[in-house]
């Protein structure tokens, strides 16, 4: 809402661009983080009610690991495939090549906040399980205030640098969200006496390595298919990206990816009942 209001004072098309870009950032966030957070909430609540903080720490760390391992490659996918995605789905008629550039520009900066938005879904629910709604609200108000301030600052800076200014609004949202997530996770870590040791940082490292490998392959793919149709570039890039990331996760023996693959294998091998 804040970004939309400020975008009204920016060049034509800015409001539509940030609205559509934000929607695309939210899609993986809803699919990844909300599903994990909603599923974890009953467990968090039961463990908190019984005073089993050790178990709550373990459950929370597991949820954060799962979200990280999915949000990192999703972020890269949005960043590198954003232009083929928007061009293929929307370009034509009144939605011009300039419209594609404006949406893709905003999506670049929004996508960088996907990890922060996703982790927040889990972290906030952990506070709720501890019957603490005040802390997330207070930190959220602070983040909203920072978002407003950052929006004015970065919209102005982007204009000075010769960049499309609405991208500054998306960057402001990303920075405010990352700060909100960081503050809440530090407060939660202090309250619980830790967050599962090194398991979450290890997931960040593992996911980072997989995402790096994915980036190298996707950049090569996009360079090789520069003259090809957007459908081939988008679908081929997505398939390659998922395959490379999954391969790296398997090579690193990441338990979450092995569990997912075993579940898929069991589902496909299940014989139909006649």
Features from the language model and the residues they span:
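Membrane-embedded alpha-helical bundles of multi-pass transporters/translocases
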Residues: 1-274
């Amino acid at each position: 809402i804040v970004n939309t209001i400020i975008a009204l004072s920016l060049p034509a098309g800015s409001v539509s661009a940030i609205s559509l870009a934000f929607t695309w950032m939210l899609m993986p966030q809803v699919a990844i983080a909300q599903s994990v957070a909603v599923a974890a909430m009953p467990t968090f609540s039961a463990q908190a009610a019984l005073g089993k903080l050790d178990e709550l720490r373990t459950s929370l760390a597991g949820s954060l690991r799962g979200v990280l391992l999915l949000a990192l490659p999703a972020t890269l996918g949005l960043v590198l495939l954003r232009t083929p995605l928007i061009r293929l789905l929307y370009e034509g008629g009144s939605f011009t090549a300039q419209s594609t550039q404006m949406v893709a520009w905003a999506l670049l900066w929004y996508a960088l906040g996907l990890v922060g938005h996703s982790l927040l879904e889990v972290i906030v629910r952990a506070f709720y399980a501890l019957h603490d709604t005040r802390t997330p609200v207070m930190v959220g108000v602070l983040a909203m205030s920072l978002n407003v301030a950052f929006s004015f600052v970065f919209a102005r800076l982007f204009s000075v640098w010769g960049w499309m200014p609405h991208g500054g609004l998306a960057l402001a949202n990303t920075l405010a969200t990352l700060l909100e997530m960081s503050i809440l996770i530090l407060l939660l870590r202090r309250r619980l006496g830790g967050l599962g040791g090194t398991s979450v940082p290890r997931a960040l490292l593992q996911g980072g390595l997989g995402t790096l490998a994915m980036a190298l392959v996707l950049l090569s793919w996009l360079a090789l298919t520069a003259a090809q149709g957007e459908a081939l570039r988008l679908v081929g890039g997505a398939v390659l990206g998922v395959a490379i990331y999954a391969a790296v996760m398997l090579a690193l023996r990441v338990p979450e990816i092995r569990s997912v693959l075993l579940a898929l294998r069991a589902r496909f091998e299940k014989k139909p009942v006649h």
